[in-house]
Amino acid sequence: MADGSGGDDRPLIAVLDYGIGNLRSAQKALEHVGADARLTADKALIADAAGVVLPGVGAFGRCVEALGEAGLADVAHEAASVAADGTGRPVLGVCVGLQMLFDGSDENPEVPGLGVVPGRVHLLPEGVKRPQMQWNVLRWSGPTSMADGLEPDPWVYFVHSYWAQPDDPSYVAATCDYGIEVTAAVARGRMWATQFHPEKSAANGLRILENFVAETRAGVR
């Protein structure tokens, strides 16, 4: 389906299946907001999709390695890089999916990330509970279509011990307060990524996913 449609006006969204991540919950949440979401490692299907989701949970290094073992590292890098340029299809990274977009992580410093967002991932500081496993308030850094339809300062759900720090602060779409100002979301062009789990964030998370689906309906640029 080269038009990126699931066949019934629902945009086809490829959730990259490399054996690790919040796959089923992400798929169900996307379907709930009107997408035809497919868990897939099929490059032809991914190429036909109107949008791409890069999930991830667990250790940074293992996620990057598993993505490569599934033959999807180059696919994810190309899709996210093109999206960040404001062209191509929308891409959404979730949790470690956000972290993998960076150059690397202190969790596994020997493993390079995808290098789409210049910067590194760091351990949350001493003096705070690790992981952050709680609801927290998003503070938007500026206008973004990710926030369309949301009340100011929405609550979303986090589970993480590491946080991403872009070299260029303009990548930061939202932050949260957790002893320090933690990057909660990044955005550039048509590339979005969240440290929090939208699929676990009740109505606010579903709204963010709905906004992503709406972006996929705009087609390839």
What is each stretch, according to the model?
Residues 8-14:
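Extreme N-terminal starter segment of soluble prokaryotic enzymes
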Residues 14-16, 92, 157:
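Conserved beta-strand elements of the Class I
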Residues 49:
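An anion/phosphate-binding loop that grips the pyrophosphate of nucleotide cofactors and donors
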Residues 58-134:
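Cysteine-nucleophile active-site neighborhood
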Residues 103-178:
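Pocket-forming structural segment of enzyme catalytic cores
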Residues 153, 187-192:
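Beta-strand-turn-beta hairpins that frame and shape the catalytic cleft
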Residues 181-187:
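Short, surface-exposed beta-strand/loop micro-motifs that present aromatic residues
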Residues 194-221:
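Acyltransferase
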